[in-house]
């Protein structure tokens, strides 16, 4: 589709596992939706702030050891938080993960495992996760920008 990561996004990948970086670099070339990297490696202090604010549900984040990235969707210079665009980014990440043979989990479908193995679309997998959480009487935690190595 002709998208490229900005220098800022490339900088955010510093310290991230090489296999995950390669998936992100492949996905930006495959995606229908432009995206940038907002988080790669995180310090313990950054993680604590996110945990305290409720924006993260764990202090054992894979960001702490370079095994996770957060990707934000762009339309021109505007950020989009619409879930459907993250489905598209996930589809590109899944194809890139297949090509690079890297197991990746998506933060909008925690229960669904490796994105390379999804049956159907990323949206289908997210909906399966939401249905599962609701059937358990639990609220789903949708972190659509988040992708982590398994």
Regions found by a protein language model. Name each.
Residues 25-53:
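Extended, low-complexity, intrinsically disordered C-terminal regulatory tails
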Residues 1-36:
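Active-site acidic/histidine clusters and adjacent loop/turn architecture
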Residues 50-62:
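Active-site-adjacent substructure of cysteine-protease-like catalytic cores
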Residues 11-14, 42, 51, 80, ...:
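Generic, ordered loop/turn and secondary-structure boundary motif
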Residues 60-150:
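Catalytic cores and adjacent binding grooves of peptidoglycan-active enzymes
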Residues 21-24, 47, 68, 90:
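A general structural signal for well-ordered alpha-helical packing
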């Amino acid at each position: 589709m002709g998208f490229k990561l900005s220098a800022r996004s490339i900088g955010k990948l510093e310290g991230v596992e090489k296999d995950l970086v390669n998936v992100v670099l492949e996905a930006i070339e495959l995606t229908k939706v432009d995206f940038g990297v907002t988080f790669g490696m995180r310090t313990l202090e950054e993680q604590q702030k996110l945990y305290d604010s409720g924006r993260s549900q764990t202090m054992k984040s894979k960001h702490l050891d370079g095994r996770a990235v957060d990707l934000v969707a762009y339309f021109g210079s505007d950020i989009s938080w619409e879930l459907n665009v993250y489905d598209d980014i996930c589809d590109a990440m899944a194809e890139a993960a297949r090509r690079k043979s890297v197991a990746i989990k998506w933060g909008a479908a925690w229960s669904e495992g490796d994105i390379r193995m999804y049956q159907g679309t990323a949206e289908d997998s997210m909906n399966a996760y939401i249905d599962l959480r609701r059937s358990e009487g639990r609220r789903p935690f949708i972190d659509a920008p988040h992708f982590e190595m398994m």
